[in-house]
């Protein structure tokens, strides 16, 4: 469990980025954001390009955010290479990809970050990745399994899902830190969306998808129940993943749940709320 203590005057959360790094820099400038923390709730877009691409992006954020005293915190989604979220690979003063179960302490709040999720389009992405590996193997005259390890630009990672981590939850309990807010990529089973109407085509292609999605939401239920049983007094839970905004303004068990939309390029807009 990593704890990030950051001095700031405000803390915000935004939904899925899907590689919209430059638009986020412009958003920060356009809204004149200063002395703040911005938590990005997964699907950042790490891993689809070569490592050097993200190093360049990080330097751009450092230049802009250091002048404004803004810190961008990113947690992993299902459109991310999990290796970027080890706490070391992307750990700049103002631009950080944090591990699951990290705690952000800022503005008098303790915010627990829980990444991971299942890709509804994983069947298609796996096929595309296998096709890329075949091409690489043929071009470099090597076995397919070796090519799959070496291709730089991947589009799917098998270890994308949410992880229930007893050890990390034990650490949180022993630390005595009260969690005020949870920021995650996906959410518990009783939160929106409550149906799978929008993903029927993916369910037809991927016979194990529905059970895996149900298990994902059940895992979030288990995490919540464990935190509650440990005496945590959580007030707000913010998540992304589902690509629309929802807030029913009625708390569930004393917790206010907010789902954030993804970055909309045609609107040039992030779905951002203050925590």
Mark where each language-model region is.
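Beta-strand-turn-beta hairpins that frame and shape the catalytic cleft
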Residues: 2-12, 103-113, 178-181, 250-257
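Active-site neighborhood of phospho(di)ester-bond hydrolases with catalytic His/Asp-centered motifs
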Residues: 13-15, 38-43, 71-79, 97-99, ...
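Binuclear metal-dependent phosphoesterase catalytic core
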Residues: 105-107, 221-230, 242-275
């Amino acid at each position: 469990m990593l704890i990030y203590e950051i001095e700031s005057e405000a803390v915000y959360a935004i939904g899925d980025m899907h590689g919209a790094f430059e638009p986020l820099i412009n958003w920060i400038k356009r809204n004149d954001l200063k002395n703040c923390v911005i938590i990005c709730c997964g699907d950042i877009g790490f891993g689809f390009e070569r490592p050097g691409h993200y190093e360049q992006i990080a330097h751009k954020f450092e230049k802009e955010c250091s002048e404004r005293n803004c810190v961008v915190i990113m947690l992993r989604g299902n459109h991310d290479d999990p290796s970027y979220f080890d706490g070391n690979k992307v750990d700049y003063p103002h631009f950080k990809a944090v591990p699951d179960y990290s705690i952000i302490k800022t503005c008098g709040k303790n915010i627990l970050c829980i990444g991971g999720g299942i890709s509804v389009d994983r069947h298609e992405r796996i096929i595309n990745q296998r096709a890329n590996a075949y091409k690489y193997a043929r071009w470099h005259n090597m076995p397919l399994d070796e090519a799959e390890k070496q291709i730089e630009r991947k589009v799917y990672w098998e270890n994308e899902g949410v992880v229930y981590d007893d050890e990390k939850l034990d650490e949180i309990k022993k630390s005595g830190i009260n969690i005020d807010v949870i920021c995650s990529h996906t959410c518990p089973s009783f939160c929106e969306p409550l149906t799978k109407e929008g993903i029927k085509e993916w369910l037809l292609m991927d016979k194990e998808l529905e059970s895996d999605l149900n298990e994902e939401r059940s895992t979030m239920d288990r995490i919540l129940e464990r935190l509650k049983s440990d005496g945590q007094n959580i007030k707000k839970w913010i998540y992304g993943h589902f690509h629309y905004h929802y807030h029913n303004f009625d708390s569930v068990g004393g917790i206010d749940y907010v789902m954030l939309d993804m970055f909309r390029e045609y609107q040039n807009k992030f779905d951002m709320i203050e925590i």
